[in-house]
Amino acid sequence: MRVNITLEHKESGERLYLTSKNKRNTPDRLQLKKYSPKLRKHVTFTEVK
């Protein structure tokens, strides 16, 4: 079952990206490297509940 999730950068508090994941294949929190326009570099965004 695929669910929509929000990705947040913990240090700046940005919630810019929406994506989906399969809960069966990825039960842990998703972490993706994405571009942060606020910091102007690629940083790690983490799944938020």
From Swiss-Prot:
Query: In its UniProt entry, what is this protein called?
Result: Large ribosomal subunit protein bL33C
Coiled-coil ranges from the UniProt annotation: none
- One annotated GO molecular function: structural constituent of ribosome
Disulfide linkage: none
* GO BP, one annotated term: translation
Q: What is the source species?
A: Streptococcus pyogenes serotype M1
Ordered alphabetically, the record's keywords are: Ribonucleoprotein, Ribosomal protein
Quote the cellular component terms of the Gene Ontology held in the record.
Answer: cytoplasm; ribonucleoprotein complex; ribosome
Q: Per the UniProt record, which residue ranges are transmembrane?
A: none
Q: Which residues form the signal peptide?
A: none
Report the sequence similarity comment from the record: Belongs to the bacterial ribosomal protein bL33 family.
Q: Name one Pfam family in it.
A: Ribosomal_L33
The cross-references to SUPFAM superfamilies, in alphabetical order and at most eight, read: Zn-binding ribosomal proteins
User: Which top-level group of life is the source organism from?
Assistant: Bacteria
Ubl conjugation among keywords:
no
Query: Per its UniProt record, what InterPro entries does this chain match?
Result: Ribosomal_bL33 (IPR001705), Ribosomal_bL33_CS (IPR018264), Ribosomal_bL33_sf (IPR038584), Ribosomal_zn-bd (IPR011332)
